[in-house]
Amino acid sequence: MKKRKWLSLLLAVMMLVSAVPFFPVTADAAADGTVEVSTWAELKEALNYTTKCSVVKVVKDIETKSLNGHTGLHQDNIIFMTMAMDKVLDLNGHTVNAYAKYYSEVAQGYLINISHKDARLTIRDSVGGGALIGEFNQEFYYEFINVSKGTLVMESGTVKM
């Protein structure tokens, strides 16, 4: 009987120990739903196909000229919002300079596409001086943000082409 009690106690202790994480738990978003980004890839990941965060906060100027062999943004760099989500892009006083050297590389002519009826992107600049800048090397029709469905709200900040 004593052996059985000890085994039960040992089993309970083992179950307790195995339930406690030994490594720190990491999360994509902070407790308030904010994700901080400092590159175009991080910005794309935070806005593309995810509902894990509600605020995407730019924490450093983002420059895209050096991407893809210094030709800037290409087709695979386009941000697609194709599912129901409500995101705030906080420029936080920083500049996002989206550069595309060749129109053929960004065939759609846009860099952010909102294409779901329940997708909403709000752009704000909580600090002041923040901007989305589209820099295109060729004389073609470009849109920084295309809204085929869904909603785009511009609370503050600047968009320059």
Regions found by a protein language model. Name each.
Residues D61-I62, H94-T95, V127-G129:
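Acidic glycine-/aspartate-rich tracts in secreted/extracellular proteins
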Residues A30-V59, T64-G69:
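Acidic Gly/Asp/Thr-rich repetitive segments characteristic of extracellular carbohydrate-active
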Residues T64-V88, N97-D125, E135-L152:
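Extracellular beta-strand-rich solenoid/capping regions of secreted or surface-exposed proteins
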Residues M1-L10:
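Bacterial N-terminal signal peptides that target proteins for export
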Residues L11-A19:
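Hydrophobic core
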Residues A19-G33:
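Sec-dependent signal peptide cleavage junction
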